[in-house]
Amino acid sequence: MKQIKVAIVGGGKAGTAVLEAFFKDDGFSVTCVVDVMGDNCLAAKTVLKGKGVRVFSAIKEALTVADNIDYFVDFSTAEAVYENTQTYIGAKKAFIMCASGLDVKQKQEIEKRCLAEKIKGAIIPNASTLAVLGMYFDKIAAPFTRDIIISETHDVTKADAPSGTAYNTLVECARAKGHNNFEEKDFKLSGTSVKNSQFIRHVSSGIEVHARRPQTEGVTTQFVELYSEAQRLTIEHVAYNRQCYKKGIELAIVYLEKNGGFLQGLEAAMGLV
């Protein structure tokens, strides 16, 4: 595969970690970074020093060097993801969306537009390959279980609770058990919504998610307990730092370069479907 030129959108913790990983891989080059804070973003103050990589404060500014960008890799905020995808599609630029915040209808609309306009794209809110494998195994095991409890831990700076990965694990396990109702009224919550609750329970399937936000940084975990009569299966994923996302992004790009089209999640790129 030719060297891939990327633009990183979001120069915070995740974007900075992935930047560092890209700098170590000769198969990729970083054209620019986009962050609303410009030169004051974390990436600009740390890993970009001495690299000669330009920092823009808006995607439209980065499009001035679009000929040197093969893929936009987006780690922006949930509030920005939909608008950002519209900008990429409007500019006919390939993208890997790694931020959460899109609902089902928006994902379907984005995929439909990309396929119609032959724009390569992917929506992978969790780019950690082993986290995706964990969810895959959870889904396989779910029909054989009575109770499922999902526990996830992120540091206190994470904006949403539960995480998108934990919520998606609940949805996939519930579907595997024959449940397809996922409106707000179908959950018992400790907070104001399914995106702002440290405890949620899917009423019909009984699957629970417990979210923890300790005053620490670094390690994130998801711990899934699957119970049946007199037995328990535990599937745990631990991410030691955010550089774990780089492998998933690489797999998505390799898949799209070979096959074109659009990816919803990493499963196809990992050969799981």
Per-range role (PLM):
Residues 30, 55, 95-96, 121:
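Hydrophobic beta-strand scaffold residues
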Residues 5, 9, 13-63, 146-273:
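C-terminal substrate-binding/catalytic lobe of Rossmann-fold NAD(P)-dependent oxidoreductases
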Residues 132-145, 161:
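Rossmann-like NAD(P)H-binding beta-loop-alpha module
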Residues 70-73:
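N-terminal Rossmann-like NAD(P) cofactor-binding module of classical short-chain dehydrogenase/reductase
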Residues 94, 109-127, 146-151:
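Rossmann-fold dehydrogenase core element
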Residues 99-121, 132, 136-137:
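Rossmann-fold NAD(P)-binding glycine/threonine-rich loop
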Residues 77, 84-107:
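ADP-ribose/adenylate-binding Rossmann-like module
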